[in-house]
Amino acid sequence: MLDDRARMEATKKEKVEQILAEFQLQEEDLKKVMSRMQKEMDRGLRLETHEEASVKMLPTYVRSTPEGSEVGDFLSLDLGGTNFRVMLVKVGEGEAGQWSVKTKHQMYSIPEDAMTGTAEMLFDYISECISDFLDKHQMKHKKLPLGFTFSFPVRHEDLDKGILLNWTKGFKASGAEGNNIVGLLRDAIKRRGDFEMDVVAMVNDTVATMISCYYEDRQCEVGMIVGTGCNACYMEEMQNVELVEGDEGRMCVNTEWGAFGDSGELDEFLLEYDRMVDESSANPGQQLYEKIIGGKYMGELVRLVLLKLVDENLLFHGEASEQLRTRGAFETRFVSQVESDSGDRKQIHNILSTLGLRPSVTDCDIVRRACESVSTRAAHMCSAGLAGVINRMRESRSEDVMRITVGVDGSVYKLHPSFKERFHASVRRLTPNCEITFIESEEGSGRGAALVSAVACKKACMLAQ
C-alpha cells in the first residue's frame, strides 16, 4: 500500500516537472536573447532606426560622475511605484577628508485616484507631500536645489527637461504623456505657493542607482533595477549616441529594456502564462521582457502555473480555493517566502492556508518547485539582458578584459533568497572576458538624484564664474 502511494507521489512529481520544464532556458536560448537585445540596443541608438526600436536607449544628459567635491543640502524626490519618497540629502566633507552623504527621508503612499486621475492631481499631491516634509524639517524658508528620480520612459531634452513617453507600472494619470515632467512639477509647486524649489535635474532610478554606487566604487558604470519593474542604464561612448550632438566622452543611456520583446523578439520564449498575464495587464503587448522578470508580475505567473497543475489534477486534489482563482492573490512576496522555507514546509503551509487551501506535504513541495521555476527563469532572462549591455561596452572600448561594477537596487534582487546568486552566476557565464563586481545601492534613487543635482549645481557655479 505504502509502495503504491510512494509510486503515485513519484509519478505526480514527474508529471509536474514535465510541465515546469517549459521554464528552463538553455545557454543557447540565453545567447539568442542576448544577441537580439544587443541588436535592439543598436537600433535604439541610431537616428534612422530609433523610432521603431523596441529598446529606446534614451540619452539622459548625465555626462559626468560625481568627483566628491560637491557640498550642500539637496532635496530629492523619488517617484517610480506606488510609494513616493521625499529625501533631504546633505553632501559634505566627513572626517579624515573623505566625502559624506547623509540622508533623512519620508515615504508617502500614492492614492489610486492620484495614479489614475489627472496629471494635475498627481503633481498637486506630490507638492503637498514636499510641503509636509519641509514643515517637519523646518526647511520651508530655504530654496533648495531639487533632484527628481522619475522612473518612467522619458525623452530628455536636457538634464532638467524631459517628455514622458508613456506611463508604465499601473500609472495612468491623464495629461502627462507627451509633456515635460519637470514643468508639471514646477507648475504644481507654483500653484501651492508656500515654498520655493529649484528643480535642477531629473533622472531615472537606474541612473540614480548607478551614480549613488559610483560614490563607493569608481568603476560603477552600469545601474540596474529589479523590483516592481526591470530596467538598466550604462555609460555609452558619445559617438554612438546619435540622438545627441557631440562625439567626446560618454553619456549615461537609459535602455528602457523592459519593452524588449514588443516587436516579437521574445515570441518563441513566451509561455501561455505570460500571455495570460499580458492580456490582463494595464498595457497589453507592451513591456514583455519586464513582465517575465519584474516583481509586479512574478506572483501572478506562479498563481497561473498552480492553477494549471490543479487542472491537471496534480495539486490540491484537483481543487483550487476561491482565493487561488482570484487574480493577484498569490503575491510576489509569497514567492520569496516559499523559497526561503527552511525545509520543514511550515512557511509554505502557512501561506497556502491563508489562501484557503489545505496542502499535503507533496503539495508544499510542488508549490516550491513552481516558485523556483518562475523566479529562476526571471533571473536567467535578466542575466541575458545585462550580459548584452556589458559585452557591448567591452567591445566598444576594445578591451581584452574589462573590469566593471554594476550598481543594483530593487525588491526582487534584494529580498528574494536566491535570485541574485542565480543571476550573478548566469551573467558571468555569458561574459567570459569581463570581471564584474555587483554592489547593492543603499537608498540609491534618492541619494543618486541629489548627487546628480550636486554635479549640475557645481557645473552651473563653474560656468557662472
Curated annotation (Swiss-Prot):
Chain segments annotated as transmembrane: none
Activity regulation text: Subject to allosteric regulation. Low glucose and high fructose-6-phosphate triggers association with the inhibitor GCKR followed by sequestration in the nucleus.
Localisation: Cytoplasm; Nucleus; Mitochondrion
Family annotation (Pfam families): Hexokinase_1, Hexokinase_2
Residue span of region Hexokinase large subdomain: 204-443
Region feature Hexokinase small subdomain, mapped onto this chain: 67-203
Binding annotation for ATP: 78-83, 228, 295-296, 332-336, 411-415
Key words, A-Z: Allosteric enzyme, ATP-binding, Cytoplasm, Glycolysis, Kinase, Mitochondrion, Nucleotide-binding, Nucleus, Transferase
Domain Hexokinase: 10-454
Recorded catalytic activity of this chain's protein: a D-hexose + ATP = a D-hexose 6-phosphate + ADP + H(+); D-fructose + ATP = D-fructose 6-phosphate + ADP + H(+); D-glucose + ATP = D-glucose 6-phosphate + ADP + H(+); D-mannose + ATP = D-mannose 6-phosphate + ADP + H(+)
Enzyme class: transferase
Family to which the UniProt record says this protein belongs: Belongs to the hexokinase family.
PANTHER family: HEXOKINASE (PTHR19443), HEXOKINASE-4 (PTHR19443:SF3)
The name this protein goes by in its record: Hexokinase-4
Organism: Rattus norvegicus (Rat)
Biological classification of the source: Eukaryota, Metazoa, Chordata, Craniata, Vertebrata
